From Swiss-Prot:
SUPFAM superfamilies: Kazal-type serine protease inhibitors, TB module/8-cys domain. GO terms for molecular function: activin binding. Multifunctional regulatory protein whose primary function is to antagonize members of the transforming growth factor beta (TGF-beta) superfamily including activin, myostatin, GDF11 or bone morphogenetic proteins (BMPs). Mechanistically, binds to these ligands in the extracellular space, blocking their type II receptor-binding site to inhibit downstream signaling. Plays an essential role in muscle fiber formation and growth both by preventing the repressive effects of myostatin and through SMAD3/AKT/mTOR signaling independently of myostatin. This is Follistatin. Residues 1-29 form the signal peptide. Residues 94-117, 167-190, 244-268 form the Follistatin-like domain.
Length: 344
């Protein structure tokens, strides 16, 4: 009886399939990472079992890849104890085909590695002078503000042209916005709501720091914009003829502080912990005492139950920064933080 012969073609086909399987397996054996750290290791695991081509197809500049096919325990040790995965291969070695997004460009750094840096298009900017940003800081020009927005403040915008001011004098707000001065005597441009709906409940009434009852928060905002100086909220409900803080009920964990200058009380948030920062600027308060910071002044006010406000920055022995603004800044009773204007 004749033995069956092995077909050489079938054996070759089997070997080809085995090689293809091994090739596919090796192609899927790598790990994809979102960045390469300064120590040269891969960090922030994106996905396992990806080929280099698949990993690098994301187009991210910082994406990197490791070839090692390791278990979960090894990956955990790399990420937690070793500062990342070794043998890290960056997807991008040059700036070719790198898309950094709007306002950024790819440039080779001193170590000859591609990096996305802020490079806003400033060619269409006509005003070359300083501008005041929405963060209350002065920038030497609008291009410098755009760079700051690119780096760390995506919501940063130009409020008005020129340096940030302590008064609304000479502040020209764009569009329909109006200049308002906050508690720290910084000028901001805000949009006034000219139409307020009629209140539907008596619980909407608010007592302003000017002793006037407002039908709603919208009406208080509107009055603030028309005045050009923040009025502020004394307490919720209609204003009453209080003889002391004992007559005023504060809500939301606030404490009543008495303003002896006008004979009225207002509810203030106390219990704030002052940061131990040497960068805080001292302030001269309405009691003619110098405090290490505005926070320290508020802490003293909460402790005594007497309202204190900032007269000017710096020591009480120093001269106020803007003597020309004394006339406009004399009525501190109309002040409260600008954030309150924007949040309501």
């Amino acid at each position: 009886m004749a033995r069956p012969r092995h077909q050489p073609g079938g054996l070759c086909l089997l070997l080809l399939l085995l090689c293809q399987f091994m090739e596919d397996r090796s192609a899927q054996a790598g790990n994809c990472w979102l960045r390469q750290a300064k120590n040269g290791r891969c960090q922030v695991l994106y996905k396992t079992e990806l080929s280099k081509e698949e990993c690098c197809s994301t187009g991210r500049l910082s994406t990197s890849w490791t070839e090692e096919d390791v278990n979960d325990n090894t990956l955990f040790k790399w990420m937690i104890f070793n500062g990342g995965a070794p043998n890290c291969i960056p997807c991008k070695e040059t700036c070719e085909n790198v898309d950094c997004g709007p306002g950024k460009k790819c440039r080779m750094n001193k170590k000859n590695k591609p990096r996305c840096v802020c490079a806003p298009d400033c060619s269409n900017i006509t005003w070359k002078g300083p501008v005041c940003g929405l963060d209350g800081k002065t920038y030497r020009n609008e291009c410098a503000l755009l760079k700051a927005r690119c780096k760390e403040q995506p919501e940063l915008q130009v409020q008005y042209q020129g340096k940030c001011k302590k008064t609304c004098r000479d502040v020209f707000c764009p569009g329909s916005s109006t200049c308002v001065v906050d508690q720290t005597n910084n000028a901001y441009c805000v949009t006034c709501n000219r139409i307020c709906p009629e209140p539907t409940s008596s619980e909407q009434y608010l007592c302003g720091n000017d002793g006037v009852t407002y039908p709603s928060a919208c009406h208080l905002r509107k009055a603030t914009c028309l005045l050009g100086r923040s009025i502020g909220l004394a307490y919720e409900g209609k204003c009453i003829k209080a003889k002391s803080c004992d007559d005023i009920q504060c809500t939301g964990g606030k404490k009543c502080l008495w303003d002896f200058k006008v004979g009225r009380g207002r509810c203030s948030l106390c219990g704030e912990l002052c940061p131990e920062s040497k960068s805080e600027e001292p302030v001269c308060a309405s009691d003619n005492a110098t405090y290490a910071s505005e926070c320290a002044m508020k802490e003293a006010a909460c402790s005594s139950g007497v309202l204190l406000e900032v007269k000017h920055s710096g020591s009480c022995n120093s001269i106020s920064e803007d003597t020309e603004d004394e006339e406009e800044d004399e009525d501190q009773d109309y002040s409260f933080p600008i954030s309150s204007i924007l949040e309501w």
